[in-house]
Amino acid sequence: MSTRAERFKEGPQTAQERRAGESALSDFADYVQQQQALRKPAVAGSQAATAASTNGASKNAHAELDILDSLDLADAKPRVRLKELLLDDGETRDDATRQLRGIIEDRLNEGHGECLFDVGLEDNGDRQLLTEQEWDAALARLKRIMNALAADWKILMTKNVPNSPVDVGNENMKQKGCIGKFMIRRRPKDVDDTIETRIAVVGNVDAGKSTLLGVLVKGTLDDGRGKTRVNLFRHKHEIESGRTSSVGMEILGFDTKGEVVVSAVPGRKLSWEEIGKRSAKVISFTDLAGHERYLRTTVFGLLSSEPNYCLLMVAANNGLIGMSKEHLGIALALNVPVMVVITKIDICPPQILQQTITQLTKILKSPGARKIPIFIKNREDCINTATQFVSQRICPIFQVSNVTGESLDLVREFLNILPHHGKYDVDAAFEFHINDTFSVPFVGTVVSGVVKSGVVHAGDTVLVGPDGLGQFATTTIRSIERKRISVPVCSAGQSASFALRRVRRKDVRKGMVVLLAKSDANPNAPVAQPKVYKEFIAEVLILSHATTIRTKYQAMLHVGPVSQTCAIIDIDRPYIRTGDRATVAFRFVQRPEFLCVGDRILFREGRTKGLGIVKQVGYDSTKPLNPDAPKDETESGVVKTSTKAVTSQA
C-alpha cells in the first residue's frame, strides 16, 4: 500500500476531477435505481446471487427496448370522451355512469386511495368547453359516483367558474369553458387503509427545520424564538441548545376533504392516535440534525427511514452553506425527489434573499443535480407542480416565514396533493429493517422500522438478527402498531412498531432484520436459515476524495439502517479517485450483516463520499477482482476471506 506522500505525488484532486465526480452522480444514481429492481434475498449463497446479478445485467443491457412492451400496437377500441361520460343523459346514461365510475376507481387503486381528476379537460388536454349548466350537471354526476365509491372530493382549482372561491381564471379565458381540478380521496375503513408518505427534513444548523414542522403540525405561528419547536425535541440538551441531535419523528394528517387535522383548541397539539384515527393521509416527517457533529446520525436517518421525498431547508439570510450541500448531495445520491423551503424571509434583506436564490438555482442546475427549479408563488403553481412532481427532475422551491405565516398555506396544499411515491413488493418474502429499539413497561421490547417487502400479522413467528456471531433468534410478534394505533397486519412500504415476545432489549440493535420463520407456501416446513455475510462486492462511484483510494482503506458504510466500518479488500484496478466507477470488495470490520444483491450502499469518511450497489454477496480471495495486481498488494495485511456465508443456527 502506498504512503500518503506517494498518493499526493500521483496528484491531488483538481477542480476538473471534482466536477467529474459531480457530473457522474446523476447517471450513476439512475443506474443504481434500475439495479435495485433486481434485488434478490441472499439466501441461496453467493453463486446464486452472482447468477441473479448477471442475468439482471443482461436484461438491463436491452432496457431501451422495454418501451415496445408498453405500446398497444393492436387495434384498440375507440375511447369514449370524458365529456360524453359526464353529460350523457340519454338511454345510455347508466352505461356512461358505470364507465366513468370504473375510470375513477382504477385511478384510486393506482394512487393507493387518492387521485386527481380534471373536469373540463380530456385526457389528451383538449378542452371540453363546458357551460355553467353543463358544469353543474357534471358535478352532480360526480357526486353520485363519489358516494358509491365511499370517497370525498376537494376542488383544488377552477377556471371560469362563477362564484368559485378557488378560481384562477381571467377575462381572456371566459370563452374557453369551465375547468376544474379535483382531489378525490377514498374514506379509509381503518388505520391500515391510511395513505402514508415519508419525508426526510434536512438542512444546515439553524435553518428552521424543527420550527417549520412545529408550525405545520400545531397550526400556530412561531414567536421568532423557537416556541413551536419545543414539542419536537426528544432530549433536555436539545431544548436548552435549540438544536436537534437525534432522529425526531412528527406526523401531519389530512382528512378525506384535504383539510389539515388539527385541534379545535388553538395551540393544542393532537396526539398521534387522534391524528391517525381522523386522517385519510398521513405525512411522516423525519426531523434530522443539521450540525456537522451529527452527520452520521443524519445519514442513518436518511437511509433507515426510506423517505419518499426529501425536504431541504435553507435559511434566507445564510444561503446554501455548511451541511446543506452535504445533505443535498446525499439526497441526490439516493435518488430521492427534493423540494426546497427557504425560511426566515421576514428578517432577510431583499438583496441577500436574491443572492440565496441565485446560488440555489445555480447549484440545482449544475451537472451533478440536473434539477429544474420552480418557484411556487401562487396556488396554481403549487397545484400544477405537485401533480408533476413524480418527475424527479423538478425541484419546487417555497419562500416562507414561520413568524408571519407567508406561503405556509402553499406548503400545506402541496403536501396534501403530493402523490404517493415508491414501489413495494407485497408478494415477496417478509423483510423488516429495525431502525430503533425501545423497552416499554408492561409490554417488553419494541422495535420500529420500515417493512421492506411482504406482509406480517400479529402472532407470527419471526427470526430477529443477526447478532455479533451471525445468529438469529426465534421470537413471536405480540402486537403491531402504526402511528401508535394497534393494527392486526402490516404490509410492504409501511412504517410500524413490533412488540417482541421473550426478547431482551440489549439483544436487539439498529440494523437488524426481522424475517418470517416459516414459508407461506409450506407453513409446516421451516424457511431456509438466513445467511449473513462479512464480505461483499459492490459497484461504486467515488463522489469526492482528496487523493487516491487503495486496498486497506476504511470508511463508515451505510446500508439501510446498518452503519458499520468497512475495509476495502480488493479493487478491480490499482487505485480509484474522484469520479471513478469501479468494482470493489468490502469487508465489515465488526460483525456480519444481512445483505441482498441490489442493496444500495453509501460510504463516507469525513468529506469523502461514495455511492454504490451490492452486486455479489460473499468474496472469494482465490478470484481477485484485479488478477494483474501484485500479490503482496492484495494479500499483505488484508485478512484472507472465505467464500462461505455465516449461516445462523436459529
Q: Which residues fall in each region the model found?
A:
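Phosphate-binding P-loop
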Residues: 189-196, 277
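Active-site glycine-centered loops adjacent to acidic/histidine catalytic or metal-binding residues
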Residues: 343, 401, 606
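C-terminal effector modules of nucleic-acid-centric enzymes and ribosome-associated factors
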Residues: 194, 198-201, 349, 504-650
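Alpha-helical scaffold elements adjacent to nucleotide-binding pockets in ATP/GTP-utilizing enzyme cores
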Residues: 141, 212-216, 248-250, 297, ...
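P-loop NTPase switch module centered on the Walker A-proximal segment
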Residues: 198-293, 305-310
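Conserved catalytic-core segments of large NTP-driven translation/proteostasis enzymes
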Residues: 198-206, 210, 214-218, 362-546
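Conserved Switch II/interswitch segment of TRAFAC-class P-loop GTPases
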Residues: 281-284, 288-295, 305-326, 335-355
